[in-house]
């Protein structure tokens, strides 16, 4: 499976970069992962234009949004597993900037998910996402992973 994580903004702090690299390394056993950082724009609309330019028609797009569908770890694992079964090998997960995602991006998404109704920095959400992707693949493969 090819997974792209599109993120608005860069990870500046070394501790976030270290955590990201660790999960990227762990995920390399299960998928081809690409993380693309896009420049923060003056508005979600401009950021949305940049995001939409990077999407292909055959991408299965998952937007992270506070108003999205809440999933358990098992629920996310099932979604990812089903995408593979359905032959959808290109998955793009989108993390917006501090003002969220544009309506155009949310409209393009095949699925909108929420990790919480709380607000978190996008760097932290990226680590949460990578960890949950790793956990999902461990669940799919029936491998143990600490809880």
Predicted feature descriptions by range:
Residues 6, 36, 62, 111-113:
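Hydrophobic/aromatic beta-strand patches that form the interior of the parallel beta-sheet core
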Residues 16-20, 48, 73-77, 106, ...:
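Conserved strand-to-helix beginnings and helix N-cap segments that scaffold or border functional pockets
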Residues 31-91:
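S-adenosyl-L-methionine/SAH cofactor-binding core of RNA-modifying enzymes
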Residues 100-104:
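Short, glycine/polar-rich helix-capping loops at beta-to-alpha or helix-loop-helix junctions
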Residues 105-147:
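Structured adenosyl-cofactor binding patch, chiefly the S-adenosyl-L-methionine
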């Amino acid at each position: 499976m090819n997974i792209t994580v599109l993120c608005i903004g860069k990870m500046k702090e070394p501790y976030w970069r270290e955590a990201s690299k660790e999960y990227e390394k762990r995920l390399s056993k299960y998928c081809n992962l690409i993380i693309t950082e896009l420049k923060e724009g003056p508005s979600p609309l401009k950021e949305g234009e940049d995001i939409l330019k990077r999407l292909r028609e055959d991408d299965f797009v998952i937007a992270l949004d506070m108003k999205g569908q809440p999933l358990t770890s098992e629920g996310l694992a099932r979604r990812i597993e089903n995408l593979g079964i359905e032959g959808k090998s290109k998955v793009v997960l989108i993390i917006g900037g501090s003002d969220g995602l544009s309506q155009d991006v949310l409209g393009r998404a095949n699925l909108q998910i929420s990790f919480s109704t709380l607000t978190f920095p996008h760097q932290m959400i990226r680590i949460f996402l990578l960890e949950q992707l790793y956990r999902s693949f461990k669940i799919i493969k029936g491998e143990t992973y600490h809880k």
